[in-house]
């Protein structure tokens, strides 16, 4: 039988990036991988050794400045549903002709869930963030979702039901697959001991992305500042960072594609501002990370033992930031009313805290011991052999 696995991801860096080292590891073991996601991720997908199966990829890049509203977040869920509705006919036909043995899909992907169910392939859910079950849900702390979110979830359920799937889902808790690969270590997952053997907590694999991208580290540890790739249209935040850290040690600041560097004003001499940095390479040399607390960025920081100053921009990031603070791995700041003094004080605090340093060292060991891409590939192969 052809050793063929389909991967299906949402068209967002935080969802695609954690899966690519797993793809590369499976390719190294002789598997043929077809990867379903937006065409703009083609170069990264093909570099991992997979063949791209392109979709429309409708997820937006994020809203403009200002706090995210429930309507904006609901819009993201609606885009996931619309992308699945448009993509499923072509994707199903592609894999009818070229069936996979397994479908490894992002847990939020309707396309992946439907493809696994309708092809009869082994289903493997990929979770770039926390897992949830009836006993442990990090998202339960957020409270009852607003009506806009509930309406978007109902639309998801209707599409799943139209393909014959049992759509028992609610915000923050998705039906598990027969195998669920979670890209966080068990020590970071709330209530990890409440999950059964369908779950594998494998942590991240940032060392697979350590290409320096042309960046040369300075002679002393760098402060890294980034709000990720989606919710980063925050020029006021970046100007506050100029005020907080200008004139000090070296700073690497990633502002994304929507913020024009020229619009930020005078750039301090010690600050290197770019749309993008090779994040794992920078974190290897970082003293601290001022971050949006996206799970991918959080995991990469912990892999390298870097303390976090979390400035979350949306609900999922708030959950991650709260967990970081609970475990003594960094601090969480409220983005509303944030000042340069707040930022400077937070960075000074996390870099001087001996107890935090010890907690980071323990979590770095745990994160590296979780197994990463090798453990994920082992779990997928073992599941296919059952």
Region locations from a protein language model:
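Active-site-proximal region of nucleotide-activated glycan assembly enzymes
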Residues: 122-191, 196-197
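Short, charged beta->alpha transition segments
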Residues: 91, 168, 211-213
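Glycosyltransferase specificity loop/lid
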Residues: 1-149, 154, 236, 252-303, ...
């Amino acid at each position: 039988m052809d050793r063929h696995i389909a991967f299906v991801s949402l068209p967002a860096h935080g969802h695609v990036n954690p899966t690519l080292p797993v793809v590369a590891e499976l390719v190294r073991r002789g598997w043929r991988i077809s990867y379903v996601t937006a065409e703009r991720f083609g170069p990264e997908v093909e570099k991992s050794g997979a063949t791209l199966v392109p979709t429309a990829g409708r997820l937006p890049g994020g809203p403009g400045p200002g706090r995210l509203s429930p309507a904006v977040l609901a819009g993201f869920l609606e885009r996931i549903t619309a992308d699945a509705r448009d993509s499923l006919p072509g994707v199903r036909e592609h894999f009818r002709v070229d069936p996979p043995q397994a479908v490894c899909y992002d847990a939020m992907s309707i396309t992946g869930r439907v493809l696994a169910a309708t092809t009869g392939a082994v289903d493997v859910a990929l979770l770039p963030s926390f897992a949830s079950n009836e006993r442990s849900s990090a998202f339960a702390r957020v409270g009852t979702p607003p009506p806009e979110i509930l309406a978007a979830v109902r639309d998801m359920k209707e599409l799943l039901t139209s393909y014959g799937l049992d759509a028992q889902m609610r915000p923050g808790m998705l039906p598990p697959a027969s195998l669920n690969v979670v890209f966080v270590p068990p020590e970071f997952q709330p209530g990890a001991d409440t999950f059964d053997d369908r779950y594998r907590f494998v942590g991240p694999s940032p060392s697979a992305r350590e290409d320096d991208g042309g960046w040369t580290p300075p002679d002393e540890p760098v402060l890294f500042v980034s709000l990720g790739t989606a919710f980063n249209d925050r020029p006021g935040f970046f100007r506050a960072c100029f005020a907080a850290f200008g004139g000090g040690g070296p700073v690497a600041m990633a502002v994304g594609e929507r913020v024009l560097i020229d619009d930020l004003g005078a750039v301090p001499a010690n600050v290197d501002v770019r749309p993008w940095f090779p994040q794992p390479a920078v974190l290897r040399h970082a003293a601290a990370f001022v971050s949006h607390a996206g799970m991918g960025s959080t995991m990469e920081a912990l892999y390298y033992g870097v303390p976090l100053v979390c400035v979350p921009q949306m609900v999922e990031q708030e959950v991650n930031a709260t967990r970081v603070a609970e475990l003594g791995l960094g601090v969480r700041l409220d983005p509303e009313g944030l000042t340069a003094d707040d930022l400077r004080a937070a960075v000074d605090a996390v870099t001087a805290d001996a107890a935090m340093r010890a907690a980071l060292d323990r979590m770095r060991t745990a994160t590296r011991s979780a197994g990463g891409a090798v453990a994920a590939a082992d779990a997928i192969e073992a599941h296919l052999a059952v």
